[in-house]
């Protein structure tokens, strides 16, 4: 029973220290500001400053158009419209699927390919003082949690 209480206290303290905000669909963790102090046994180390150089990402989209000559094609019209294909005018008054056989017809198929790249390597901060971030941020409650 006591170990369950310790676990619940630890979870409550951890979520309080980091500012865990949650609802049924998502969670957000708010990290303490850079003014926070991380406390160890007998020392206090200022929290590391966030990196001022965020990685730069570039998105690239290449668009190409492919053409295909077909003997017939099927299209869906979800609402009333009028269009012309091979000199014939088609009028649609309600949602319907049409098969056009007045061909040969050239179908245009736009395609695109997206790529993402970064100009920076991802680095992690491995400061030994971070191991005690939660108890330090909680003060006395954190010290009590460490004793349990």
Curated annotation (Swiss-Prot):
Induction: Induced by transcription factors MSN2 and MSN4 in stationary phase and by transcription factors MSN2, MSN4 and HAA1 upon weak-acid stress. Up-regulated by low pH. GO terms for molecular function: structural constituent of cell wall. It comes from the Eukaryota. The keyword Glycoprotein applies. It is a lipid-anchor; GPI-anchor. Its main location: secreted. GO terms for cellular component: cell periphery; extracellular region; fungal-type cell wall; side of membrane. The GPI-anchor is attached to the protein in the endoplasmic reticulum and serves to target the protein to the cell surface. There, the glucosamine-inositol phospholipid moiety is cleaved off and the GPI-modified mannoprotein is covalently attached via its lipidless GPI glycan remnant to the 1,6-beta-glucan of the outer cell wall layer. Residues 1-19 form the signal peptide. Residues 128-148 form a propeptide. A lipid is attached at residue 127 (GPI-anchor amidated asparagine). Keywords: Cell wall, Glycoprotein, GPI-anchor, Lipoprotein, Membrane, Secreted, Signal. It is found in: Secreted, Cell wall; Membrane. The keyword Signal applies. Glycans are attached at residues 41, 59. GO terms for biological process: fungal-type cell wall organization; response to acidic pH. Cell wall protein that plays a role in adaptation and resistance to cell wall stress. Belongs to the SED1 family. This is Uncharacterized cell wall protein SPI1. It comes from Saccharomyces cerevisiae (strain ATCC 204508 / S288c) (Baker's yeast). The lineage of its organism: Eukaryota, Fungi, Dikarya, Ascomycota, Saccharomycotina.
């Amino acid at each position: 029973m006591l170990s369950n209480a310790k676990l619940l206290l630890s979870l409550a303290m951890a979520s309080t220290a980091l500012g865990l905000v949650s609802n049924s669909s998502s969670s957000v963790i708010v990290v303490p500001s850079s003014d926070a102090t991380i406390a160890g046994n007998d020392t206090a180390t200022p929290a590391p400053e966030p990196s001022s150089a965020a990685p730069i990402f570039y998105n690239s989209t290449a668009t190409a158009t492919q053409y295909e000559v077909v003997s017939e094609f099927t299209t869906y019209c979800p609402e009333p419209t009028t269009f012309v294909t091979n000199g014939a005018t088609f009028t649609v008054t309600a949602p319907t699927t049409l098969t056009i056989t007045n061909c040969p017809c050239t179908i245009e198929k736009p395609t695109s390919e997206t790529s993402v790249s970064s100009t920076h390597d991802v680095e992690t901060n491995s400061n030994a003082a971070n191991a005690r971030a939660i108890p330090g941020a909680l003060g006395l409650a954190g010290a009590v949690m460490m004793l349990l």
